[in-house]
């Protein structure tokens, strides 16, 4: 968690900037597919700054360096950045955004450089306008300068084999999905859709890969028109069964040829437009609002391209019945694994007085999970955190630099797994000793927020932006809050963080209404820096519900929870719960016992633990 000395790396980067007449250089977190989680070879921001969090942007001028990140990572960034760096806390009053800070450095006609494959076209336009106001200019630098600094030490690009995702789990064939997409393209009168998001490609073709840790995706692009379906992928990644499965319905092309083909398509669209009557609007290619600037430029820019919220993202977010049933099933197995783990951990720490560190514990959890049906791997790096480490929202325990678990302190475990039938993400906060009154109060207020989301009933058209305050209301009444969203979309054996829906104050969460079939996390928290952290997280699925009345004749929605792991009885202060909330807790625990106790018929330790933790409060 401690800082590394970035002085030499920054010095070399500044030499390269000087050679290319670039005064300020931007290093985003994302890869060329705008992935949140990336392969090791794409960890450029981490390499140049030393900050390992999943979100952030580094900016380097000739004399300064800044790292911008959000509230999940303030503590972590403060610990990991050396004295070469300024921390820009996103969302803090009187703190500039990274775009504003960049523009300040560009005053007086300076040039700001960025790899155009690592920034979206819309972000590039907005940034260019911001920089222009200060007299600077934005330049797309085709050769990535951090890669040149990294040199031969940069990890190789992964090239793992791709596998079929069976129809029993996908619930819909890739032919049906492409047919649905073509209907959307027809509605928009578009020439085709150029797809760059990796999870969208995996979902569309019912394929899964292993190129990015914890995310079952593979490096590829795709172009879908009314008559063609082209998949751009290195062919050695495709076993014979995958090629046979795709058959003649999909043309395979080299991954590296996407930009040349995009240029040809763009030129063809332009020529066609020039030759047609001006009264008829030209057909444009659709790209996602999250597609790269370089892809937009290859297609000919705004005259040939329309940027839209991807229709695949919208379709993928509404799970079909097979996917929903898979989510229910995998969360029962995952809940059983977590109960076995927590029972084991308590026994080791309290009864056996075993000395365990945070990584020892998380390794055991992975071992337990791996025994369950359809297990593939973890869905993210487990957060196993004791005491003050639990206050670091996205804490990462390193094997050689982690804490011994203190049975007299709060223990927070945020973990998830990839199963063939679904993706899990569960957080539980426990205490193996005697919690303080403040710890119990904080836990119970967080629990009330979780229940408020879980039991919410709302009209069709309601967004996650509107629901976010439901989870915070009890903390707010005490003058408390948390610096992260309340929930994110979850993929079906895909990325654990999935758009476009979620619960929070992000602009995107105000743009898309929650719909039946959405799978979302419900994870309020509270963190006291240097002391303790609390988070409780369940996965919930949106569904239509019956109401006594139906104002406006709209459908009304609610949620179904699928996470099957007990809450920590010891941390609940029942006097802070209403009768309805107590009933919710008791009903939830009864459901957990009924669905998971069968796994422990020959495991007395876990069965006894589960029985105790699911007793009525």
UniProtKB/Swiss-Prot annotation:
Keywords: Aminopeptidase, Hydrolase, Manganese, Metal-binding, Metalloprotease, Protease
Gene Ontology CC terms: cytoplasm
Positions annotated to bind Mn(2+) 1: 425, 523, 537
Residues that bind Mn(2+) 2: 414, 425, 537
Origin superkingdom: Eukaryota
Keyword Plastid attributed: no
Note on how the cofactor is bound: Binds 2 manganese ions per subunit.
GO BP annotations, alphabetical order: proteolysis
EC number assigned by the record: 3.4.11.9
Reactions accelerated catalytically: Release of any N-terminal amino acid, including proline, that is linked to proline, even from a dipeptide or tripeptide
Entries under PROSITE patterns matching the protein: PROLINE_PEPTIDASE (PS00491)
Keyword Protease: yes
A GO term for molecular function: metal ion binding
Protein name per Swiss-Prot or TrEMBL: Probable Xaa-Pro aminopeptidase P
Source species: Ajellomyces capsulatus (strain G186AR / H82 / ATCC MYA-2454 / RMSCC 2432) (Darling's disease fungus)
